Regions:
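Glycine-rich nucleotide cofactor-binding loops and adjacent beta-alpha elements
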Residues: 1-226
């Protein structure tokens, strides 16, 4: 799609004309402007279902950014959200939610049966309309192949369809939705994937699934220059 059309339909006159003619009105995508740009800014809301295993890790990763971190409160199904971080501000989502969120993150890694998927509804139903243009939706689950019981595997597998459906709904505003499946005890490997999916680097990536396996704790790298000090043979 040409830049001229994109600029035109995002003017007041162009937007009105596009709506009258039934033409698409794509949102300008936020792109990476400098290498040291923070991976996420603005307000970020985190929620979690029963038995969430990655909630503290997610709080630590997002807490390293300039973003203002909030954790969802209100519904009983989201009680685990309070474990996000002591820096996170509690936000009751059962009332009127004001402002816009740069990202909505949900830890579903502990869900054990389909009934517990209710937590997803309780978190996203009152907040999805508050997702900002170019916002990010990220869901963390457990890889169904590592689940020991059928109900747990079914609940985790359902996350894929949910994320793809959300991605289609929010795509028109330049937002993305992605899913990360982690193996048991692989929470410490989430950092790079979370940073990527929340950043402008993932502007064209939506409805995707990434699997993360367990690995030994690696030496921390510079997220701005991860290949610094290394030699590449091409």
């Amino acid at each position: 799609m040409s830049d001229l059309y994109l600029k035109l339909v995002n003017t007041p006159v162009g937007k009105t004309a596009a709506q009258s003619l039934g033409l698409p009105s794509p949102a300008p995508l936020k792109r990476l402007k400098r290498v040291d740009q923070p991976f996420i800014e603005g307000d970020v809301l985190i929620g979690a279902g029963n038995g969430a295993r990655a909630i503290a890790t997610l709080g630590s990763i997002v807490g390293a950014s300039p973003a203002t971190l909030h954790h969802a409160t209100g519904p009983e199904t989201l009680a685990e959200s309070a474990k996000t971080s002591n820096k996170a501000q509690a936000l009751d989502i059962t009332g009127e939610v004001s402002g816009k969120f740069s990202a909505l993150i949900f830890d579903a890694s502990g869900l054990q049966k389909p009934d517990e998927l209710r937590a997803l509804y309780d978190f996203f139903h009152p907040t999805i309309r508050k997702l900002a243009t170019n916002g990010r939706v990220l869901v963390i689950g457990q890889d169904p192949h590592t689940c020991r019981k059928a109900p747990q595997a079914a609940a985790q597998q359902a996350l894929e369809g949910f994320v793809r459906a959300v991605g289609k709904e929010i795509g028109k505003k330049g937002a993305t939705a992605n899913l990360v499946w982690i193996a048991p005890n692989a929470e410490n490997q989430l950092d790079s994937s979370v940073r990527f999916f929340l950043s402008p680097r993932s502007a064209y990536v939506s409805g995707q699934v990434v699997r993360i396996g367990k690995a030994d704790e690696a030496k921390a790298t510079n997220p701005v220059a991860p290949l610094s000090g290394k030699v590449a043979l091409v």
